[in-house]
Amino acid sequence: MSRATAEMLAPQLANIDPWARYNYTPAALASFLAAGEADAPRYAIAVGRAIAGAVCIRKNWLRGPYLQFLGILPPYQSQGIGSSVLNWFESQAREVGAQNLWIAASEFNVRALSFYERHGYGRVAVLTDLVVEGSSEILLRKRLPRC
C-alpha cells in the first residue's frame, strides 16, 4: 500500500473500533499500513475508484495465513465487502495448500466476532492483555480441508 493511501485511510480507521477504543493514532495506523513487509503485505480495498478499507495478511503463521488487519470504512460496511475479502483470503490460502486460516478480534468487538463466526471461524483461544492491559483478544481458526 502506498504511503499516500495509508495516510488517507488512517484518520478514518482511527475513529472506528477496535482502533478508537485502543487509542491508535492516525500516525500509528498510517505507519503500520504503509510498512513494507514481504511476509505481511498490506492491500487497499477498492470499490470502483474509491478506497473502502485495508487488509493485511501475514502469510506464514501456524500452517496457514493470519488476517492481521481488516478495516472497512463505515460508508462501505454491511455491503458484502468484508465477505469478499474473506473469500479472497481463503482462496489465496487454498492456492498454497494452507491448512488453517487465522484471525484475532477484540473481545468487545462483538460485531466482528459474529461476522467471522458466520464465515466458519471458531474460537480457539482467549489472549488476555495482548494489545492492551485489561482487554482480551479472541483467536479464531478456520480449518481448510486437504484436497
Task: Enumerate the language-model features and the residues they cover.
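Internal amphipathic alpha-helical segments of the cytochrome P450 catalytic fold
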Residues: 64, 78, 112-113
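Hydrophobic residues at beta-strand termini and immediately following loops
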Residues: 1, 124
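Active-site acidic-Proline motif in GNAT/NAT acetyltransferases
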Residues: 73-75, 79, 107-108
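C-terminal "cap" of GNAT-fold acetyltransferases
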Residues: 99-102, 106-113, 118-119, 125-147
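Short, functionally important structural connectors and interaction interfaces within domains
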Residues: 62, 122-123
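Acetyl-CoA-dependent GNAT
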Residues: 2-69, 73-75, 83-88, 92, ...
